[in-house]
Amino acid sequence: MKIHEYQAKEIFSKYGIPVERHTLCRTAAGAVAAYKRMGSDRVVIKAQVLTGGRGKAGGVKLVDNTEDTYQEAKNILGMSIKGLPVNQILVSEAVDIAAEYYVSFTIDRNTRSVILMMSASGGMDIEEVARQSPEKIIRYAIDPFIGLPDYLARRFAFSLFPHIEQAGRMAAILQALYKIFMENDASLVEVNPLALTAKGILMAIDAKIVFDDNALYRHPDVLSLFDPTEEEKVEADAKNKGFSYVHMDGNIGCMVNGAGLAMATMDMIKLHGGNPANFLDIGGSSNPVKVVEAMKLLLQDEKVKVVLINIFGGITRCDDVAIGLIQAFDQIKSDIPVIVRLTGTNEHLGRDLLRNHSRFQIATTMQEAALMAIKS
């Protein structure tokens, strides 16, 4: 679960990490009022959406007067970043930055531990730094039995700050970030940039926290911060109906029984140059009601131009699945092409049933199904 920058900064402040003064606004007039209240010569207006790349998309602007504050706030509130509409902005006091750093804690599956990542090259282009100059990213695996005691925090801090005063401040921030990570079952805690101001203060100018969805039941306070996007609302609705659904950006809707087969289906589509619109595991039922609900879910996405149904019949027989599909599509009013691949128990009976129904195009292999979907 992701949260907004302003929410992450509230958590940072609670744990003693310095952040700049800021106000959340939902209108351009509110942004002007926040600018006046701050009494600062310059403020930064930031779009509050649950995605990265806000700066490059024009969602972060520096202003120094009320007219520009109003206009830029209005522009940002009217934009969409990576398909996400901007409904709120953060007006923050502009900080005189001497240097920018990158700091994060996340899970490293190679070391099977929490890993601390730091860089003296913080800012918007940290992804480019990681690609072009990976040696500039410092990594430390954290032993879960030791954690991050003072001596380790100071040792890691000295990697970026040679002077003891700054290293001491950095060590305290590292310990606070690690505490946030562990106490809240996070999967990512990130500061980019962590700014060294002209006055020598270390301050989190941006804040990002991602929480482990599977641990949210232990943190009702964290769950209360959830601000679902439209996609997440759809995914939650699918979960309530017994599906595993993840939205993607392609145009081939996928309906599959079994997570592994669903992943393999998506891989096959990508292998042949297509783009899946979703991951959708409907489970092992041949219940036509479930198929109807799954199709409604797929057809909500206007990008979907064809549906690929890939079913493996194990305990669930393919002829039962075919009957369920026929009953379901008798209720569905759509002329979208539907490719069906059945394999497993009674697969020949299932295919014969579907061939008698003009609604379906039949494939015998997963590769054939993927190619048919791509060409449709």
UniProtKB/Swiss-Prot annotation:
Taxonomic superkingdom: Bacteria
Cofactor note: Binds 1 Mg(2+) ion per subunit.
Pathway: Carbohydrate metabolism; tricarboxylic acid cycle; succinate from succinyl-CoA (ligase route): step 1/1
Catalytic activity: succinate + ATP + CoA = succinyl-CoA + ADP + phosphate; GTP + succinate + CoA = succinyl-CoA + GDP + phosphate
Residue ranges occupied by any ATP-grasp domain in the UniProt entry: 9-237
GO cellular component, one term: succinate-CoA ligase complex
UniProt record, GO biological process: succinyl-CoA metabolic process; tricarboxylic acid cycle
Chain residues that bind substrate: 257, 314-316
Keywords carried by this UniProt record: ATP-binding, Ligase, Magnesium, Metal-binding, Nucleotide-binding, Tricarboxylic acid cycle
EC numbers on record: 6.2.1.5
Binding sites annotated in the UniProt record for Mg(2+): 192, 206
Names of the cofactor(s): Mg(2+)
One MF annotation (Gene Ontology) recorded for this entry: magnesium ion binding
Coiled coil segments of this chain: none
Gene3D superfamilies assigned to the protein according to its UniProt record, in alphabetical order: ATP-grasp fold, A domain (3.30.1490.20), ATP-grasp fold, B domain (3.30.470.20), Succinyl-CoA synthetase domains (3.40.50.261)
Binding site for ATP: 46, 53-55, 95, 100
Entry-linked InterPro entries: ATP-grasp, ATP-grasp_succ-CoA_synth-type, ATP_grasp_subdomain_1, Succ-CoA_synthase_bsu_CS, SUCC_ACL_C, Succ_CoA_ligase-like_bsu, Succinyl-CoA_synth-like
Pfam families: ATP-grasp_2, Ligase_CoA
Family: Belongs to the succinate/malate CoA ligase beta subunit family.
HAMAP family for the chain: Succ_CoA_beta
Subunit structure: Heterotetramer of two alpha and two beta subunits.
Reported function: Succinyl-CoA synthetase functions in the citric acid cycle (TCA), coupling the hydrolysis of succinyl-CoA to the synthesis of either ATP or GTP and thus represents the only step of substrate-level phosphorylation in the TCA. The beta subunit provides nucleotide specificity of the enzyme and binds the substrate succinate, while the binding sites for coenzyme A and phosphate are found in the alpha subunit.
Name of the protein described by the UniProt record: Succinate--CoA ligase [ADP-forming] subunit beta
Gene: sucC
